[in-house]
């Protein structure tokens, strides 16, 4: 899981390498992230290296290699990993347009919040609509959508935090690698990665402190797939 600044720096380094083949200087990185000192960049670089996203090459100045990037799920969901598209809480508001008309295709969409979902020990999912959140339409794609408030930390390594709003596309099926809302025994709902293991279904956490749950298909009902995260800062 990357912090916002870590992700911004990784993206900046990767874009600069694509453009010129040369990584940015520490001063350029500091300016790009609007930091006051280069010590903050050093800490971010070290964190990215420890997490395996970049590598500093020895005995070479400004030698940084990007090893991998967080995978971002599209509407179909990630197959190998998931780093959610994160919407800040104020992005759902219509920006002032100086009196102009906002195109319908750009208007935020009201998505109903249907209750809580466990990213930890399964809890009962509330099925009553409490309120709505405004989401940019290009986050949603086609189909019916709803949101659930995440409770727990079992998906933190996928970038899904306690208190986040999980944006869900209603779906009764899933492919291996999808992060899904799974209803267990018609009683408990949980947010986990879906995989098939022979004739069974595995619900995998993204936190080594939690165990994988292996269940027969008749005990698991897919209620939707994760397409994004709404997070307030």
From Swiss-Prot:
Quote the catalytic residue positions: 154, 192
Reaction catalysed by this enzyme: Hydrolysis of Ala-|-Gly bond in repressor LexA
Q: Which keywords fit this entry according to its UniProt record?
A: Autocatalytic cleavage, DNA damage, DNA repair, DNA replication, DNA-binding, Hydrolase, Repressor, SOS response, Transcription, Transcription regulation
Q: Give the matching Pfam families.
A: LexA_DNA_bind (PF01726), Peptidase_S24 (PF00717)
Q: Where is this site: Cleavage?
A: 119-120
**GO process terms (BP):** DNA repair; DNA replication; negative regulation of DNA-templated transcription; proteolysis; SOS response
Q: Does the keyword Glycoprotein apply?
A: no
Provide a Gene Ontology MF annotation, just one.
DNA binding
Task: Give EC number(s), comma-separated.
Answer: 3.4.21.88
Give the top-level enzyme category. Answer: hydrolase
From the UniProt annotation, which stretches of this protein bind DNA? 26-46
Function in brief: Represses a number of genes involved in the response to DNA damage (SOS response), including recA and lexA. In the presence of single-stranded DNA, RecA interacts with LexA causing an autocatalytic cleavage which disrupts the DNA-binding part of LexA, leading to derepression of the SOS regulon and eventually DNA repair.
Assembly, per entry = Homodimer.
Family of the protein in this entry = Belongs to the peptidase S24 family.
Q: Please give the name of this protein.
A: LexA repressor
Source organism: Nitrobacter hamburgensis (strain DSM 10229 / NCIMB 13809 / X14)
Q: By which gene is this protein encoded? A: lexA
């Amino acid at each position: 899981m990357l912090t916002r600044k870590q992700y911004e720096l990784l993206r900046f380094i990767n874009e600069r390498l694509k453009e010129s083949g040369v990584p940015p200087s520490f001063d350029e990185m500091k300016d790009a992230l609007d930091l006051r000192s280069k010590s903050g960049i050093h800490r971010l670089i070290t964190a990215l290296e420890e997490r395996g996203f970049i590598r500093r090459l020895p005995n070479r100045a400004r030698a940084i290699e990007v090893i991998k990037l967080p995978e971002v799920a599209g509407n179909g969901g990630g197959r190998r990993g998931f780093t959610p598209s994160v919407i800040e809480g104020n992005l759902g508001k219509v920006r002032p347009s100086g009196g102009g008309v906002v195109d319908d295709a750009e208007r935020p969409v009201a998505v109903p919040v249907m209750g809580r979902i466990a990213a930890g020990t399964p809890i009962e999912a509330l099925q009553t609509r409490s309120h709505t959140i405004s989401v940019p339409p290009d986050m949603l794609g086609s189909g019916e959508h709803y949101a659930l408030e995440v409770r727990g930390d079992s998906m933190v390594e996928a970038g899904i935090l306690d208190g986040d709003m999980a944006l869900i596309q209603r779906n009764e099926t899933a492919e291996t690698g999808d992060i899904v809302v799974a209803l267990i025994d018609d009683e408990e709902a949980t947010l986990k990665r879906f995989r098939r293991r022979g004739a069974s279904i595995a619900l995998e956490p993204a936190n080594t402190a939690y165990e994988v749950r292996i269940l027969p298909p008749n005990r698991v009902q897919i209620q939707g797939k994760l397409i994004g995260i709404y997070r307030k800062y």
